[in-house]
Each structure stands twice: as C-alpha cells, then as structure tokens.
C-alpha cells in the first residue's frame, strides 16, 4: 500500500452508513495526536464507544473474539478497520504482518514502535480492550434467555461503570444494532468519543468509593441491546434490565459500547455549548438503581480534591493524576499535565500564567516537553512533538495560540465550570504577576 506523504494530524469518526461504504483498497493510514479535554485527550476513553463497531466487523469477517487467536490476515483486517474508522495516515501495514498471539506478546513498548506517535496508542488501547473482553467472555457463566441477533453485543460491563443521566427505557423488542453513529445523534465531537475508557484502567484509589463493597467491582453482566430512537438516547444511558427472569442488572441500551460514554457535564447548559469540558459526575443518585452506590457527590474539581486531601503549598494546586481521576479520562493527558505545571510554583521558571485569564506562556518549551516525555515514558519527546498535540487542540476549541506572542497559549474551553476556580483565584494562590512582555 502506498504510504501517505501528508502527515498532518487528522481524526474523524465515521457514521455507520459511511462505514458500510468502506473499501479496504481505498484506505490510507495515519498519525493522530493527543486527545482533548472537551471530553478529555490522549487515549482516554470512549474507545469502547467507537471501537464497538469492530464487533460488527468481527461478525462479518469471522474474526475471533480473542485477539490471541487471530491469524496474520485477521491482524491486517483489524488494523485496516482502525485506519478507516479514524482516517489514519502513516501506518506501515508490513510491520503488522504477524499473528495475533505474536502481536499480543510484544508488550506495549515494542508495540508502539510499529506505528507513528499516538496512532500506536490508539491501536494498543483497543488491543487491550479486546483481550480483556475476551477473558470476560470466556469466564462468564451467564447465558441469555433471549435469542441473540447477529449484532448482539459480546461485551460485558461491571458495576464499576460511571453513572449517567437517563430517561425511562423503552420496552424491549428484538435486539438491534444501532446503525446511526452516536456522533450523528448528539452534538459531540470525535475526540469525545475517543476519550472514554475502562474503569479498570483508572487509578483505583481515585475512582473507587471507599464505601463501595469490593464484591461489586468484579460482577459482570452481559449486555442486552434494545431498539432506541434518537429522542430517548442519552450519554451512556443506563437502566435496569432483565436477563432470563433475573432483575437488577445494569444494561446499556443505546449502544453496546456506551458503557464509557458516561462523562457528565458541570451544568445542563453545557450540553449546548461548543466549548465543553466534562465533569466527572454531575447526575443525581435517583438516576441509578439503589443497588449501585455512586462514586462521589456532585461538585467541581475543587470540591473533589478538598474532600480527599488538604492543599499543600509545595504541591500543585491541580495534580494531573487527581484531575484525570476526577474527569475519568484514564491516562494523564497533555492538557491535564499543563494545568499541573501551571499550578505548581516550582515550575514557574519554565511555564506560567501570564495574568490574563487562562492565558499561559512556555518560557522554556524544551523543559516542558522534557517533563512531558518523562511523565509519559517517552524519552524522545521534544517541543516539536509537544506542539503538534497543542495544535490539535486549536480546531477543538480547547487551547488556542495567542497571535503575535511566541510560546503563548490560552485555554478557551470552560475550565471554570470544570475546576471550580476562576483564573484570578488561581493567580492569587500562585502569586502570579501580570506578564508585561510583548
């Protein structure tokens, strides 16, 4: 296959109709930068939401559920699907000429060498999800009492799923695959779909309610899909379901992968906002079955941190790990890391607020890149690669470059609703002086 010369980062989520028209021969592969805080950024989470469509592809092509059982052709079909689904460019298919068992045995570091930056992260994330799902599928002893259709999900979900605001479920009819992309039914961007992920991958100490019984963490149930219209779909809609006459299991009704589309928003108005940053959980407890305890109460990130520890003057006001746990973004993302540095007084020599709202300056961009590389275990990270991730934020209305000022950027998403801080409050806490440099 002819390698693409244009490596400009691109990422798009195709609708189901576009997916049907997909031809492997028309496909080229690609380079995808960090995901964003509109719903979060780098590999975080609705990987399940977008990757769920691979279940249909597995059914169509007869690809085994367990990736360790894949042949060389299965591996190629999987990579081809991902390339088409995300409009990736820059992937060398020859590097993936191996069996599924060999692919899974590579380990993360070796696997990431097979694809360009960020593309490898996406593929690895999906491969891990597929392996976990196959284990759950093999160990489950629950047999559905209803006939499964061709597109009935093989996935499982746990009580550990984040809660979502729901509307009353429709009555169950024949299992049906939702043919419209989630993106076509809601004003949600592609990176929001990609930013959801397993709770099993989150820092357990940050996400689990200490009062929640451990026994609930390991309970899994099969998903029963229902016919859902756009009018009654919601983000990661959860409801009570029945399986073989047994009540009180949780099912996702809009899409088998919506178990990660449960990111909530700090206010109802933010549903209609183009600059949205999700809060971790802003829904009422009555939206959930009484058997499922909530992870935490409502509140901003400020409340979330205050409930867990007193602020230490020698530590960042906004630790990236805590912010990742609060938003449910999984791995720490670039925007979260930048906020950590910006709220750490010891880092003001190389990155700091300018004193003008959410604007900040990289006084030493190489040092920022070095620290980001150290945090992500990528020793080859440099400012050129870091800036590629920042540029990806421009079109997403997450971060903008300030015109006429070198290395100066501004958060343009709604950080105030997410964090619970106004910029002036953070500036005062950090003794920020207005930047007089032109």
From Swiss-Prot:
- Region listing for Helix HI-2, in residue ranges: 320-327
Q: Where is the PNT domain?
A: 49-134
Q: Where are the stretches annotated Helix H5?
A: 423-429
Q: Which UniProt keywords apply?
A: Cytoplasm, DNA-binding, Nucleus, Phosphoprotein, Transcription, Transcription regulation
Pfam families attached to this UniProt entry: Ets (PF00178), Ets1_N_flank (PF19525), SAM_PNT (PF02198)
Residue ranges: DNA binding: 332-412
Q: Which GO terms describe its biological process?
A: cell differentiation; positive regulation of DNA-templated transcription; positive regulation of endothelial cell migration; positive regulation of erythrocyte differentiation; regulation of angiogenesis; regulation of transcription by RNA polymerase II
A GO cellular component annotation in the UniProt record: cytoplasm
Membership in a protein family = Belongs to the ETS family.
* Protein name per its UniProtKB record: Protein c-ets-1-A
Q: Which organism is it from?
A: Xenopus laevis (African clawed frog)
**What gene does this protein come from?**
ets1-a
